[in-house]
Amino acid sequence: MLYHFLYPLSAELPLLNVFRYITFRSVWALLTALLITIFIGPRFIRWLKRVKCGQYIQEEVSCHVQKAGTPTMGGLLIGFSLIISVLLWGDLTNVYLWLVMLVFTGFGLVGFLDDYTKLRRKTNQGLTARSKFLWQMVIAAVAMYFLVKEPAYSTVLSFPFFKNLQPDLGWFYIPFAMIVLVGSSNGVNLTDGMDGLAIGPTVVAGIVFSIFIYIAGHSQIAGYLQVPYVPGMGEVTVFCGALIGAGLGFLWFNAYPAQVFMGDVGSLSLGGALGFLAVLCKQELIMLVAGGLFVLESLSVILQVGYFRMTGGKRIFRMAPLHHHFELKGIPESKIIIRFWIMSIVFGLMALSVLKLR
């Protein structure tokens, strides 16, 4: 919005020419989302308490009993700050910006319905896994349909380390990308089981993809690093900046001991957005590295359930997702969180290193 109002005045006021730079607007999108989140956070948390949006705790995780009643649905705060920031600093004529907002909002709506159902039933059981998966797939399909219709966007799949291996999947690219979106969304959701555990790695992955997105939208840098160039993609860096800022602002209140939880409205929307960012910049497979922690958490659940069914009740882990396994081994929650953050940073650096390994 500010871009559309102020940049046209740059002919009379040369200082306003800075609004044409994506980097400038991305930094301010970050700062705006951060400040909005921190400023309205205390009032928002008090409101959640007043309307009794308290978290219900799994009986199996007895060490979390003291967290019962902590306000949830904090993802609404993330969403509000992010959307306001993007609307202020983004070029609202950019179709990719609107598509990532569609994914973020759509997945967030599914998460909101899940959280609302839990609160209404006064349990930790929300929407059924099948209905949640179905709605996620519908939103992903709609977003991908509009994305592949863009003339500048390609359905070619880029493989890390192999610059000449770029098969064109055609319409098969849509179901593949849908799996990336839904898998990423549920991966963040599974990771969100401790104070600050999910939002930290989400911010790290957001930083990684902000770099990939900016490069994908810059013809010269993309050509030099031999990554797919997508005209107009650089504008999505503004969304990445807002995501990072809103995430850091939320961490201010979600860090151990948490004053608020993001809920599914936060984890599903952020995870879906990260998956779509990977698709937008043609780094779908890099999501496995940049979001390595989410992959590990998801794999722990898949292995646990599969092994349990095959062996008639035996388990690989004491409890899944993986962070609960370490928790039940007696490792303090704060130490698990910091160690997982360190792992996410390492995964992020590994993902960025791929830029020079072609």
From Swiss-Prot:
Listed InterPro entries: Glycosyl_transferase_4 (IPR000715), PNAcMuramoyl-5peptid_Trfase (IPR003524), PNAcMuramoyl-5peptid_Trfase_CS (IPR018480)
Transmembrane spans: 21-41, 69-89, 92-112, 133-153, 169-189, 196-216, 233-253, 260-280, 285-305, 335-355
GO biological process, one term: peptidoglycan biosynthetic process
Enzyme kind, highest EC tier: transferase
EC number: 2.7.8.13
Membrane disposition: Multi-pass membrane protein
Keyword annotations of the record: Cell cycle, Cell division, Cell inner membrane, Cell membrane, Cell shape, Cell wall biogenesis/degradation, Magnesium, Membrane, Metal-binding, Peptidoglycan synthesis, Transferase, Transmembrane, Transmembrane helix
Example GO molecular function: metal ion binding
GO cellular component: plasma membrane
Family of the protein in this entry: Belongs to the glycosyltransferase 4 family. MraY subfamily.
Subcellular localization(s) per the UniProt record: Cell inner membrane
Main function: Catalyzes the initial step of the lipid cycle reactions in the biosynthesis of the cell wall peptidoglycan: transfers peptidoglycan precursor phospho-MurNAc-pentapeptide from UDP-MurNAc-pentapeptide onto the lipid carrier undecaprenyl phosphate, yielding undecaprenyl-pyrophosphoryl-MurNAc-pentapeptide, known as lipid I.
Cofactors named for this entry: Mg(2+)
Swiss-Prot/TrEMBL catalytic activity: UDP-N-acetyl-alpha-D-muramoyl-L-alanyl-gamma-D-glutamyl-meso-2,6-diaminopimeloyl-D-alanyl-D-alanine + di-trans,octa-cis-undecaprenyl phosphate = di-trans,octa-cis-undecaprenyl diphospho-N-acetyl-alpha-D-muramoyl-L-alanyl-D-glutamyl-meso-2,6-diaminopimeloyl-D-alanyl-D-alanine + UMP
The name this protein goes by in its record: Phospho-N-acetylmuramoyl-pentapeptide-transferase
Primary residence: membrane
Pathway field: Cell wall biogenesis; peptidoglycan biosynthesis
